[in-house]
Amino acid sequence: MEFPKDFTAREKALLGDRFEELYTYATAQPARGVTVNTLRCTPDWFAAHTDFAAEPSKFCRTAFTTAADFRPGRHPWHHAGLLYAQEPSASAPAALLDVRPGMWVADLCAAPGGKTSQLAAALQGQGLLLANEFVAARAEILRQNLERMGVTNAVITNEDTANLAKALPGQFDRVLVDAPCSGEGMFRKEAVAAAQHSDALVAHCAELGAEILENAAALLAPGGVLVYSTCTFAPAEDEAQIAHFLAQHPEFSLCDLSGCGFGRPGEGNRAPDHPDFHAEYTRRIWPADGGEGHFMAKLQKAADAEMPSQPKVKPPKAAKPPAEWLEFARAYFPALASRPLAGAGEWLLLPAPGSEGLNTAKLRVVRGGVLAGSVLKKRFQPAHALFMAYGADCTNREELTLADSRTAAWLRGEEIDAATAQNGWCAVLVDGFPLGGGKVSGGRIKNHYPKGLRNLQ
């Protein structure tokens, strides 16, 4: 491949003799990998049971490198939410955020959902995750991926980050900004990234990233931590971006990432207008380091920073549980029968715990919890999302394995024989992990796996 001329001129000037190293690795085969969803299993369990080659990655304990020609999207474990296809170094920013159960976390540029699913896994169902995506079509992809991964405590929004900052000031312990960028780290994976590259694009992305970073700062609570990342080499979007932000925000300090165990230090010559900026505290992952090209900076807000005034939040009124839902839940998901419900048109929703404290009245909320289902003709019709989130707890289950021929048939949308599940609704699982739900009658399970998700080839 050929680098864009403006990119080549800039990087030759900045890298000198090291440019040849960049060129050599950037023209090699792109790195491939998966991230393991610890809401489903541990990395050790995955490593011990996987049926495809996967080596642990240095970028994150849940990331694995796979063969360049491996495509996980058709694997049953992918359908069951154990895996997210993600080149290994892309897992680093979420890992650096150091999310712990019980925190409130915001991912401001969340689609398609790889890093978001990592944050959700780190929360382990405790605390709250705000997953935002500005582009509506991408927000829908984000919703589908979080549903597949079995995330129960996420509120997904389709908003400008300025609106989030106004509605939810100072409310989050952790904020991730994986900023929209010029994508220079994607050149060897996507030819269109190189074809569309220009200095004007870099300038536009730097301006957009600065705006999002400002809004992220407003969302962060005193003492909270923010990670800013890109998949580009452009100084204006990376070192210079963070240096300028810190110059404007004395309440923030730059955390030293030199001990993170991967990549290389950021470079001061990429922020020449800020001689006091500790570029070496930031982190770069070059193609030679086993990734595609990432930049990361970790910032902490002072504990004594001013806490903004909080808007008054009127808790949403809980929906009265329909008798049909209660009958269904008590039969198949007893622990859910006492959970509060919210109405979402004709659908019923199990709200994300804690979301009643979010000021979302004027925000575009795509999904605020787990879609439970709807009442049709005086019967409760469960949603696919319900089985993906809670299928392992269903009282009526059909257990499959990778080697079971019924697994492939199920993912093609076919009816399968019921070996253990009794008449009525049942969860279908592979190796103990949900693959959706179906309805049993006469020893056969009618397939309710969504048509758009099936392995049809």
Where are the language model's segments positioned?
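Class I S-adenosyl-L-methionine
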Residues: 172, 225-228, 233-349, 354
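Helix-to-beta-strand junctions that scaffold the AdoMet/dcAdoMet cofactor pocket
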Residues: 123-124, 220-222
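A short acidic, Gly/Pro-enriched loop at the edge of an enzyme's catalytic core
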Residues: 100-101, 165-178
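Conserved SAM-binding loop of SAM-dependent methyltransferases across substrates and taxa
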Residues: 112-125
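Mobile active-site "lid"/loop adjacent to the S-adenosyl-L-methionine
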Residues: 137, 173-214, 231-238, 263, ...
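S-adenosyl-L-methionine
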Residues: 132-169
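Conserved class I S-adenosyl-L-methionine
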Residues: 102-111, 130
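Polybasic, low-complexity RNA-engagement segments
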Residues: 1-47, 292-295, 300-457
